[in-house]
From Swiss-Prot:
Keywords tagged on the record: Chaperone, Cytoplasm, Nickel insertion
A Pfam family assignment: UreF
Role this protein plays: Required for maturation of urease via the functional incorporation of the urease nickel metallocenter.
Keyword Chaperone among UniProt keywords: yes
Molecular function in Gene Ontology: nickel cation binding
Position of the signal peptide: none
Protein name per its UniProtKB record: Urease accessory protein UreF
An annotated GO cellular component: cytoplasm
Length: 229
């Protein structure tokens, strides 16, 4: 039997969902222009690196912390990790991109659901206290829908895999079938990545591969581009 609450959260994983994810490569375009990423095999290597070395130690750990803070009604903890998500994201384009995507996701979530937590989160932004982040909003929405933290993280990882693969299909380019083969291969690694996220300590938050950040920074100087970041 289909769990409709899970489906409601999965709706936000659609690569065509209007959060602006289609406009961001998070440094992938720099690798493509250097021809470091140029086919399915090299894209999969980059995607593994991005998911395991950057997303895991930023969004992933933050989602776990936010979920437990929601259970404990710990607003200060949510504000703290939200601020850290913003300031530890050193590349300007990815930092601004996350803020824009977070703002769009929050507004869409409020248009669809009456969540007190998401409304509170939005109000913090309106009062100039924080910048909004998609990982925090996605966690709040999953919590509101009664979805367990393991599934929330799984769906968020899938969302990133799906949107980045669609962007790679356009930019490298790859065929649509090749893109679906990438997603199929990456799905097999989602559970392992999620379990790793759940095992990490909070002190691990913010660790990332310098090469990813450097290429995200260098994207600012790419003259011919199809992505904002």
């Amino acid at each position: 039997m289909i769990d409709h609450q899970h489906l409601r959260l999965f709706q936000f994983c659609d690569s065509q969902f209007p959060t602006g994810a289609f406009s961001h490569s998070f440094g992938l375009e720099t690798y493509i222009q250097r021809e470091t990423v140029h086919d399915t095999e090299t894209f999969i290597k980059w995607l593994h690196l991005f998911i395991n070395e950057q997303l895991t130690y930023s969004d992933g750990i933050a989602m776990r912390i936010v979920y437990h803070a929601l259970i404990n009604n710990d607003k200060d903890k949510i504000l703290d990790i939200n601020q850290k998500l913003f300031v530890q994201n050193l590349p300007k384009e990815t930092r601004i991109g996350a803020k824009q995507m977070g703002t769009r996701m929050v507004k869409l979530a409020l248009d669809l659901y009456d969540s007190e937590w998401i409304q509170w989160y939005y109000n913090q932004m309106k009062n100039n206290k924080i910048k909004l982040h998609p990982a925090v909003c996605f966690t709040m929405l999953g919590h509101f829908l009664g979805v367990d933290v393991e599934s929330i993280i799984d769906y968020y990882l899938y969302q990133n895999i799906s949107s980045l693969t669609q962007n790679a299909v356009r930019a490298i380019p790859l065929g649509q079938t090749a893109g679906q083969q990438v997603v199929t291969e990456m799905i097999a690694h989602i559970e392992k990545t999620r379990n790793h996220i759940l095992e990490l300590d909070e002190i691990d938050f913010g660790m990332t591969a310098p090469g990813l950040e450097l290429n995200q920074m260098e994207h600012e100087n790419v003259h011919v581009r199809i992505f904002i970041s």
